[in-house]
Amino acid sequence: MSFLKTSDPAVYNAIMQETTRLKETIDLIASENYTSKAVLEAQGSVFTNKYAEGYPGKRYYAGCEYADAIEELAIDRAKTLFHAEHANVQPHSGAQANMAAYFAMVKPGDTIMGLTLSHGGHLTHGSKANFTGKLYHVIEYGLNAETERIDYDNLEKLALEHRPRLIVTGASAYPRILDFERFRAICDKVDAKLMVDIAHIAGLVAAGLHPSPVPYADVVTSTSHKTLRGPRGGFILCKEQYAKAIDQAVFPVIQGGPLMQVVAAKAVAFQEAMQPGFVTYQKKILENTQVMAEELRKLGLRLVSGGTDNHLVLVDLSPIGVNGYDAQLALRRAGIVINRNTVPFAENQTANVPAGIRLGCPAATSRGFGPAEIRQTVSWIGKILKNIGNEDIEKQVLAEVIHLCRKFPVPGIDA
């Protein structure tokens, strides 16, 4: 970055500070990960200079022959990786992938169903604060209060009562396997379409370690980062009968030109996910997450649903008298990066000051952490949570965290 260092020291310094932060902290945010050096190089390539409105072979600008080649490569790889009939790799984000899917499948004012945000859903699944809550008539479904898993019986009851045009599944904080076959059966009973958002679990699905929604869903949306380890962006998979509607919804309805440098990086990430080592990596994520869950239980902490089937755990801190906001700040001061999160059915919580925290293992696993490092990290978490606001303990843990982190290079930066 010699040119940037000279031309814009302020931006250069911020990048260097962020690099140091990545090296000296343990990232347990379930939606974050480290990309490979190859993905970073593709995203920083000359494709950032190219406008490519339209689709391969049907561009509105000249000079798109290599943009076409890159996008076709990304499309083919996405289809192969997920065994899909059609793929659109242009969405700038998961939220925009979802928006395009809605615009293609339903009309404003139609009834849709989505998992309520406080039970692990996502803003784009029907939140009143989101465009979905403003454009559509949203019926929320939730979890069973005893099992803290999706209440499929009540979901079916609500579907039969309200007859939605679209049912959305997928989550941002749900630690259990989703029953796509049951969702499909419910949709068929009310003649609804099924949309599945696999943003969090795409890597697990690609590796065959979580059931795939592709055989059951009309449309599947995802991000290309998180467990998939690609660049920040989105993509859509669908059955061939919806291909034209999906493509038109992405362009020209919600986007103009695609970010071709990101499309190039997506192509690289899809190729990386096809390698045998990617399955091994995803298995390690699951192993580390099981170790994390067990160690958290040993500390006496309550896990939502009692455990996890995927890459994340949701911890209810209300029994120990700590809120998620204070926990997030204290752990950050100690070099452990997590996010606060609402807990299903918890009382006296808000989005800003929720009752719990969400922890995940994708980034730590990418860095090379195994069960031993996860156990050590959870022990530090326990020490911080039991001594909220104790600066001496926070400094002690921070020093130990930095010492551990120096043994594990950061993908894309150190290796």
UniProtKB/Swiss-Prot annotation:
(6S)-5,6,7,8-tetrahydrofolate binds at residues 117, 121-123. Its cofactor is pyridoxal 5'-phosphate. It is an enzyme of class 2 (transferase). It catalyses: (6R)-5,10-methylene-5,6,7,8-tetrahydrofolate + glycine + H2O = (6S)-5,6,7,8-tetrahydrofolate + L-serine. Its EC number is 2.1.2.1. Pathway: One-carbon metabolism; tetrahydrofolate interconversion; Amino-acid biosynthesis; glycine biosynthesis; glycine from L-serine: step 1/1. GO terms for biological process: glycine biosynthetic process from serine; tetrahydrofolate interconversion. The keyword Amino-acid biosynthesis applies. PROSITE patterns: SHMT (PS00096). The modification N6-(pyridoxal phosphate)lysine is found at residue 226. InterPro entries: PyrdxlP-dep_Trfase, PyrdxlP-dep_Trfase_major, PyrdxlP-dep_Trfase_small, Ser_HO-MeTrfase, Ser_HO-MeTrfase-like, Ser_HO-MeTrfase_PLP_BS, SHMT-like_dom. Transmembrane segments: none annotated. Its main location: cytoplasm. It is found in: Cytoplasm. The record marks 225 as: Plays an important role in substrate specificity. Catalyzes the reversible interconversion of serine and glycine with tetrahydrofolate (THF) serving as the one-carbon carrier. This reaction serves as the major source of one-carbon groups required for the biosynthesis of purines, thymidylate, methionine, and other important biomolecules. Also exhibits THF-independent aldolase activity toward beta-hydroxyamino acids, producing glycine and aldehydes, via a retro-aldol mechanism. PANTHER family: SERINE HYDROXYMETHYLTRANSFERASE, SERINE HYDROXYMETHYLTRANSFERASE 1. Homodimer. HAMAP family: SHMT. Belongs to the SHMT family. This is Serine hydroxymethyltransferase. It comes from Dehalococcoides mccartyi (strain ATCC BAA-2266 / KCTC 15142 / 195) (Dehalococcoides ethenogenes (strain 195)). The lineage of its organism: Bacteria, Bacillati, Chloroflexota, Dehalococcoidia, Dehalococcoidales.
